[in-house]
Amino acid sequence: MIIRSPEPEVKILVDRDPIKTSFEEWAKPGHFSRTIAKGPDTTTWIWNLHADAHDFDSHTSDLEEISRKVFSAHFGQLSIIFLWLSGMYFHGARFSNYEAWLSDPTHIGPSAQVVWPIVGQEILNGDVGGGFQGIQITSGFFQIWRASGITSELQLYCTGIGALVCAALMLFAGWFHYHKAAPKLAWFQDVESMLNHHLAGLLGLGSLSWAGHQVHVSLPINQFLNAGVDPKEIPLPHEYILNRDLLAQLYPSFAEGATPFFTLNWSKYSEFLTFRGGLDPVTGGLWLTDIAHHHLAIAILFLIAGHMYRTNWGIGHGIKDILEAHKGPFTGQGHKGLYEILTTSWHAQLSLNLAMLGSLTIIVAHHMYSMPPYPYLATDYATQLSLFTHHMWIGGFLIVGAAAHAAIFMVRDYDPTNRYNDLLDRVLRHRDAIISHLNWVCIFLGFHSFGLYIHNDTMSALGRPQDMFSDTAIQLQPVFAQWIQNTHALAPGVTAPGETASTSLTWGGGELVAVGGKVALLPIPLGTADFLVHHIHAFTIHVPVLILLKGVLFARSSRLIPDKANLGFRFPCDGPGRGGTCQVSAWDHVFLGLFWMYNAISVVIFHFSWKMQSDVWGSISDQGVVTHITGGNFAQSSITINGWLRDFLWAQASQVIQSYGSSLSAYGLFFLGAHFVWAFSLMFLFSGRGYWQELIESIVWAHNKLKVAPATQPRALSIVQGRAVGVTHYLLGGIATTWAFFLARIIAVG
């Protein structure tokens, strides 16, 4: 840490009334671009309008103006999020069986949507139990509401209205900070201030207030709910806050107030700030007292972190100093120059944030099932499967987005003249080594992982089970994974002596938590089948990385096209007369990377879905005998490609295929429709622009004959537009097909 004289204080950080509010301007399509504002000559105009509306770089080159637009757009985004949340809470208040579910969460399904009877649509309202007819929801909102202490639909109404007010506030803020008081560029670039406020404010105080809410409201209410008290009898949230005796009845140390805190006698608080590990056997969720303790600890950490960076007081860390001091023996100038990149290129900044947020989202997916945080979440199999699938897809998209914006940074913001021998320059200089090695890894992983399956299929077909790779023949046990599992299972007695159980039941240790006769979680065994599919995961992760990284590292130049930077981020080919230069733009790498991201995530969610149904989810008898949904068939069936097709895709598709005439029929229709959307994408991906232009001209001729030709000249989609439409429908169709397949299956059997 360096102590130096105070920084010169920045006085005026905003411009007043920089841009007048003009509805006339907003009403004019394409007002942000001289070309588009002229109006349409051809149908390409509408595509350009959509492509460039949010590409602020194309509106102006003034970084301050771009920053203000992005900042303002963030408020718009927050407004939409609040609106969405408000809708969710309103549905919970108006159309749901939340209060009934609260009284019996194990036998009543969550529902917050009732379909109107139009032409037989009432068939979609299934019986979710408790005399309620509706669509079973799988978002996990009911479980979150219970965990936060919501006991009535009135409280949901109030929260929904509160979210609407916040949405309006955000819309106002977006307008105000662009038109009335717009921050100067220096404000956006003041990273130390930003870090302090985000760390201490958002994460620190945010976690602290949540911990406070949990201790004062959630814990007592959940204590009553777990004991079977009728929600209408439970005191309201404000009563605990105003009346300490209510809390003291449940947690006696509350009677002492803050005395133990100031006398450092903190163990007094261990009644409601626990360190138990494992799951609450009543609800099948993490101990809420553990969660409160966790948020309090996180709050302390981030409140400290929010005081580490140097602002007006001349004390603390400076990010530029930290980055420039970051040199290794083999890294030349190290991180020198990165500070300038990250404060002048929002694409570079966004790229890092997307990569980290995407990875974090995937980590969330894995923790939601292994450490289910909310009461009765673990036994709601449809919600568990939905949450895992959702977070995996989102994570995949965010990571591809990271590569996209890294490439845009390379094309638009990277200045090679003042970058020499820093880390980025060194990576770019040995990009051939990186990409060729990565290519080798992909080929190795692809052939070997798939080869293991093909070997098994062949041996199985030839009737030689003793020669297959399986737990009963030639074993390929994941020994490292099993060692990690075992280490964690033993942790409570050894490395974490304060804990009573390990962080997750999945590690092992033999104990099982069941709620209402359903398995919440148990130790997950790993064997040869998992070893095989994990190598497919390794393969399908490395391929999109290869494609995307190649796109970033060769975004500005390559041996094939040395002046690629001049052609921009997206272009179809390097002009006429240069054959073999199509699909080389950075945009095309993102386009191709998306398909492999789709492959990668699909394998992960298939693996998860089948593994959980086979080895975890199921019912438990009074004698303690567990019957899994698919009876433990994963270990022997998933070791061949044929097994995946026959015992997973085909066997488990029976519910969605046979859903017609039942309350699940919407999933059957979606399954059909999404297949159609997916197939529709192939029309865009497999045909060229000229084919359609020819067809269009013949259709225009017919219109001219009938004197109904439009003034705007119809044009075929450009090559890039066609690919964009194609990949969108491919992903949308594929994801919606999987969604219908998963939900019809798990709602029927779960």
From Swiss-Prot:
GO cellular component labels: chloroplast thylakoid membrane; photosystem I
Transmembrane segments: 70-93, 156-179, 195-219, 291-309, 346-369, 385-411, 433-455, 531-549, 589-610, 664-686, 724-744
Molecular-function annotations in GO: 4 iron, 4 sulfur cluster binding; chlorophyll binding; electron transfer activity; magnesium ion binding; oxidoreductase activity
Cofactor-binding details, from the entry: P700 is a chlorophyll a/chlorophyll a' dimer, A0 is one or more chlorophyll a, A1 is one or both phylloquinones and FX is a shared 4Fe-4S iron-sulfur center.
Binding-site list for chlorophyll a': H675
Catalyzed chemical reaction(s): reduced [plastocyanin] + hnu + oxidized [2Fe-2S]-[ferredoxin] = oxidized [plastocyanin] + reduced [2Fe-2S]-[ferredoxin]
Pfam family, one: PsaA_PsaB
EC numbers on record: 1.97.1.12
Binding site for phylloquinone: W692
GO biological process terms on file: photosynthesis
Residue positions binding [4Fe-4S] cluster: C573, C582
Family that this chain belongs to: Belongs to the PsaA/PsaB family.
Its job: PsaA and PsaB bind P700, the primary electron donor of photosystem I (PSI), as well as the electron acceptors A0, A1 and FX. PSI is a plastocyanin-ferredoxin oxidoreductase, converting photonic excitation into a charge separation, which transfers an electron from the donor P700 chlorophyll pair to the spectroscopically characterized acceptors A0, A1, FX, FA and FB in turn. Oxidized P700 is reduced on the lumenal side of the thylakoid membrane by plastocyanin.
Assembly behavior: The PsaA/B heterodimer binds the P700 chlorophyll special pair and subsequent electron acceptors. PSI consists of a core antenna complex that captures photons, and an electron transfer chain that converts photonic excitation into a charge separation. The eukaryotic PSI reaction center is composed of at least 11 subunits.
Protein name: Photosystem I P700 chlorophyll a apoprotein A1
Origin organism lineage: Eukaryota, Viridiplantae, Streptophyta, Embryophyta, Tracheophyta
